[in-house]
Amino acid sequence: MKLSTAVALRVSNILREKNMSQYRLEKDIAMPHNTMKTLMGERNKGVNLKTVMQIIRGLNMTTSEFFNDPIFENPDLEID
């Protein structure tokens, strides 16, 4: 699995846990829809740390909380 896919899955899972829509997150952090769509899409070719940090803050989480998930512990995680 690629890192960008892992980040997108983690964001999706957190949104579901928080009963929050992607649209609501976009509005809360003033992120353009196309930016979020690219990050969450299958054609995402990489993740931008600034964008990920913006999302983490919008989810009211720490960086440690966000990355503390088994999905990021996969030794075969591809850095894209």
Where are these regions (language model features)?
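A short, Lys/Arg-rich alpha-helix, primarily the initiator
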Residues: 1-21
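Residues within the helices of the helix-turn-helix
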Residues: 12, 23, 53, 64
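Short, charged recognition helix plus adjacent turn
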Residues: 13, 38, 67-80
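The alpha-helix within a helix-turn-helix
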Residues: 15, 26, 56
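DNA major-groove recognition helix of helix-turn-helix
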Residues: 15, 40, 51
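Short alpha-helical DNA-recognition segment
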Residues: 19-38
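The DNA-recognition helices of helix-turn-helix-type DNA-binding domains
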Residues: 32, 43, 70-74
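Short, basic-rich loop-to-helix N-cap that marks the start of a DNA-contacting helix
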Residues: 43-54
